[in-house]
Amino acid sequence: MPLSLFRRVLLAVLLLVIIWTLFGPSGLGEELLSLSLASLLPAPASPGPPLALPRLLISNSHACGGSGPPPFLLILVCTAPEHLNQRNAIRASWGAIREARGFRVQTLFLLGKPRRQQLADLSSESAAHRDILQASFQDSYRNLTLKTLSGLNWVNKYCPMARYILKTDDDVYVNVPELVSELIQRGGPSEQWQKGKEAQEETTAIHEEHRGQAVPLLYLGRVHWRVRPTRTPESRHHVSEELWPENWGPFPPYASGTGYVLSISAVQLILKVASRAPPLPLEDVFVGVSARRGGLAPTHCVKLAGATHYPLDRCCYGKFLLTSHKVDPWQMQEAWKLVSGMNGERTAPFCSWLQGFLGTLRCRFIAWFSS
């Protein structure tokens, strides 16, 4: 009888562990659930007419050029003209990375038209850094969809050989090396390509070999589920019934605009169907709606922060998180110091065995306790 009771207690504990693992703060259940989204997609819509997008004032058309391979990861940072401190903090931290895990990384800043007195400053900044993409629309939160589409269209026109594009914001810290590793695991280059960096000639040959290969469709981010439009006119997230009628129900699942990854094939698919989607001012929702119309569902990744801010922590920022939101310029550079050596070279992040065992779960608890 005591043995039978012991077995019952053991089974109950195991059941609680399974439930906690799947549906608790680890986020594993969310990732597994997102895999079912593809089976719920409607038939893809037919391509729409070409998008009518604002012209580029600063095109930086040769940003992806050079004698080496094209970017494995191209990062588009949405920023405002007056956010110079944020851009400089990124340039001095994770945005300075040009290679991760042996692959080229490129970071560019997206913005619209500034106030007249900022025009000269922006031109000087662009000439100095050559990392600015500017389109001819008034820069505002309600124009984020225009800004993002202008960036994706630039990628398709000037950098179609990039494999993956991360769209993010200027208050987000990005763990570039771990993000590249994540993308390699999810469908990046072959192991042979990864190891080919040992000799320049071999690297070039292998990149050429993979140049014509199609990149698998990927739309990766912190997925929001069953979000309904905000009808409050004063809210910057306001969506009118004309744009999204009530009988349409909630928005389809979409990835948080603070940081999502699109493969180049996903970028091209979204651009083909975007003109048939309602012109929503919420850029991340618009991308999700367009992706759904194209037959593409988002994949949930718990390592991407979404709207969550994580306190500075060497193990979380260096190993387990791919992004952290609401990071000001000072915190951006402090986070960089945590995961970098004294000479600016990135060192292996320090995690104790317990920190490593708890992984992302520990980081989420830290964020929860500090909120």
Swiss-Prot record:
Domain of life: Eukaryota
First-tier enzyme category under EC: transferase
Catalytic reaction list: a ganglioside GM2 (d18:1(4E)) + UDP-alpha-D-galactose = a ganglioside GM1 (d18:1(4E)) + UDP + H(+); a ganglioside GM2 + UDP-alpha-D-galactose = a ganglioside GM1 + UDP + H(+); a ganglioside GD2 (d18:1(4E)) + UDP-alpha-D-galactose = a ganglioside GD1b (d18:1(4E)) + UDP + H(+); a ganglioside GA2 (d18:1(4E)) + UDP-alpha-D-galactose = a ganglioside GA1 (d18:1(4E)) + UDP + H(+)
Transmembrane segments: 5-25
GO terms (BP aspect): ganglioside biosynthetic process; protein glycosylation
Alphabetical list of InterPro entries matching this protein: Glyco_trans_31
Pathway, per record: Protein modification; protein glycosylation
GO molecular function, one term: N-acetyl-beta-D-glucosaminide beta-(1,3)-galactosyltransferase activity
GO cellular component terms given for this protein: Golgi membrane
Places the protein is found: Golgi apparatus membrane
UniProt tissue specificity: Expressed in heart, brain, spleen, kidney, lung and testis.
Membrane topology: Single-pass type II membrane protein
Keywords: Glycoprotein, Glycosyltransferase, Golgi apparatus, Lipid metabolism, Membrane, Signal-anchor, Transferase, Transmembrane, Transmembrane helix
Impact when changing W248R: In strain: pgn2
Ranges facing Cytoplasmic side: 1-4
Residues modified by glycosylation: N143
Family according to the record: Belongs to the glycosyltransferase 31 family.
Record function comment: Involved in GM1/GD1B/GA1 ganglioside biosynthesis.
Name the record gives this protein: Beta-1,3-galactosyltransferase 4
Organism: Mus musculus
Upper taxonomic lineage: Eukaryota, Metazoa, Chordata, Craniata, Vertebrata
